[in-house]
């Protein structure tokens, strides 16, 4: 039995049935990390000594009858490096936080620990979650386990790569404009971006506070649903966190879409979408129709303006959130300065990477007095129109189906020379964040064509978008599709 190939739910069940121990699961995972990390670079920090100590404690607790109802008891989990874990370095993949060690746990970490999960370490990401390739990390780029010449996506690229490379059973990521769904699509795994307010953001280092949301990445819909069930729920430490009627997402794991109304936005399948992606996504639509779902095309208005609106709003919020990193209280401080102004200037200039500086400059510009109405206010109006457009769509449909990305993963280095191309890679995902909706990305095929900037045999993902707090519908549809497919896995380097 290859332990690292099990799903998280299978692993936890075998631990409870005494077919293997928590320590064996943790050791098997760290063995995979040691073999593969030189090639993939999924992690920034690993936590082997403490993970093994936790494994021993969790094993004793399980044998004493605790965690009987937890689907994650004994499961090794990776955490994106912008989520605070007490006593563990949390860098946001930035020089400016290179040595920052939080004195507290994020709420999601407390909930994972309460469920008996084991924290493996912190995964690589785009600096401060600004990027969609995981190439802007101060600690170096992460490689896609399907092909190390290709990007894993971003900004949660380390989390997606770790799961795909069997270096973690589950990983937490964050999604501000597609940063869970896009790398999940590129790495051939499953990722859920929950409804805004479903999961507490307490302990998440902020990028754009009205858009950020924490969610799970795993190798199955079941593992994603189980993890989301554990980390969801109201939290007094996050005023934007909503108390929902139910967080029982595991009950949605049934193969039945009869009568489910699925909308296909025509605009998602127009110019700019790779032909192979279009083919596989439409095949999934045909499958749902065969299974008894009601599938119809429709026009989703205003989403063509989602990308520019998103980058105006997200950059504006980032310029405010990142103003706290000035070398005074914590984080990197320049060694040589003359006066407070020079301390600020040199610390920020030396501590932030180019992409972060670019977005902070955009944010400061659109918030300036001469351009506030021309850019920021207009972007907020577009955001409202997009939300209204989705509201009208969900009067007719239960879920919306489309591609996660315009194409499969490109080769490393392509986006760094063309930031606009990187921004446009989020064209199908950012509108979901602007509207605060839930969405899941799951694999639906592999690419066949290769060229100078892309390779054959790379995963293609589709996206299912739900109504606010409609996670159960998208999980049910995703699970139904998953049950009919034999998913290929990458040929990993050992």
From Swiss-Prot:
Keywords, in A-Z order: ATP-binding, Ligase, Nucleotide-binding, Protein biosynthesis
Domain of life: Bacteria
Top EC category: ligase
Its EC number(s): 6.3.5.7
InterPro entries xref list: Amidase, Amidase_CS, Amidase_dom, AS_sf, GatA
Signal peptide per UniProt: none
Biological source species: Lachnoclostridium phytofermentans (strain ATCC 700394 / DSM 18823 / ISDg)
Gene Ontology BP annotations: translation
Entry keyword annotation includes GTP-binding: no
Molecular-function annotations in GO: ATP binding; glutaminyl-tRNA synthase (glutamine-hydrolyzing) activity
Manganese in keyword set: no
Entries under PANTHER family matching the protein: GLUTAMYL-TRNA(GLN) AMIDOTRANSFERASE SUBUNIT A, TRANSAMIDASE
GO-annotated cellular components: glutamyl-tRNA(Gln) amidotransferase complex
Name of this protein: Glutamyl-tRNA(Gln) amidotransferase subunit A
């Amino acid at each position: 039995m290859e332990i690292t190939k099990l799903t998280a739910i299978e692993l936890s069940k075998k631990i409870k049935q005494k077919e293997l121990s928590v320590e064996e699961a943790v050791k098997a995972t760290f063995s995979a990390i040691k073999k593969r990390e030189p090639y993939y670079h999924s992690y920034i920090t690993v936590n082997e000594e403490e993970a093994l100590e936790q494994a021993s404690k969790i094993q004793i607790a399980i044998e004493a009858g605790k965690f009987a109802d937890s689907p994650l008891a004994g499961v090794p989990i990776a955490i994106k490096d912008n989520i605070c874990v007490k006593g563990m370095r949390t860098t946001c993949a930035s020089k400016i936080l290179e040595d920052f060690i939080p004195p507290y746990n994020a709420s999601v970490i407390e909930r994972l620990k309460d469920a008996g999960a084991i924290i493996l370490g912190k995964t690589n990401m785009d600096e401060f979650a600004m990027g969609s390739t995981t190439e802007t990390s101060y600690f170096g780029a992460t490689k896609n386990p399907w092909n190390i010449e290709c990007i894993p996506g971003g900004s949660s690229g380390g989390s997606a790569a770790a799961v795909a490379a069997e270096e973690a059973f589950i990983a937490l990521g964050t999604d501000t404009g597609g940063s869970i769904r896009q790398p999940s699509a590129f790495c051939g795994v499953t990722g859920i971006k929950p409804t805004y307010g479903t999961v507490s953001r307490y302990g998440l280092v902020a990028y754009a506070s009205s858009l950020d949301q924490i969610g799970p990445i795993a190798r199955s819909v079941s593992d994603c649903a189980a993890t989301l069930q554990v980390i969801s729920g109201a939290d007094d430490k996050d005023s934007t966190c909503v108390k929902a009627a139910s967080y029982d997402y595991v009950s949605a794991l049934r193969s039945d879409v009869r009568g489910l109304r699925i909308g296909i936005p025509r605009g998602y399948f127009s110019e700019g979408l790779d032909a192979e992606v279009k083919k596989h996504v439409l095949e999934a639509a045909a499958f749902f129709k065969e299974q008894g779902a009601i599938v119809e095309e429709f026009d989703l208005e205003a989403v063509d303006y989602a990308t520019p609106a998103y980058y105006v709003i997200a950059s504006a919020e980032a310029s405010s959130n990142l103003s706290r990193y000035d070398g005074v209280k914590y984080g990197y401080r320049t060694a040589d300065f003359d006066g407070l102004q020079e301390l600020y200037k040199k610390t920020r200039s030396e501590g932030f990477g180019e992409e972060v500086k670019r977005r902070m400059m955009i944010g400061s510009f659109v918030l300036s007095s001469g351009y506030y109405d021309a850019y920021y206010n207009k972007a907020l109006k577009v955001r409202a129109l997009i939300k209204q457009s989705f509201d009208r769509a969900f009067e007719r449909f239960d879920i919306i189906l489309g591609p996660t990305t315009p194409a499969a993963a490109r080769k490393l280095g392509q986006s760094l020379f063309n930031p606009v191309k990187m921004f446009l890679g989020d064209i199908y995902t950012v509108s979901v964040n602007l509207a605060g909706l839930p969405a899941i990305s799951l694999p639906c095929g592999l690419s066949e064509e290769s060229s100078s900037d892309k390779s054959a045999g790379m995963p293609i993902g589709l996206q299912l978008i739900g109504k606010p707090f409609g996670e159960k519908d998208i999980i049910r549809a995703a699970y139904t599709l998953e049950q009919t497919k034999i998913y290929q896995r990458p040929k990993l380097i050992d």
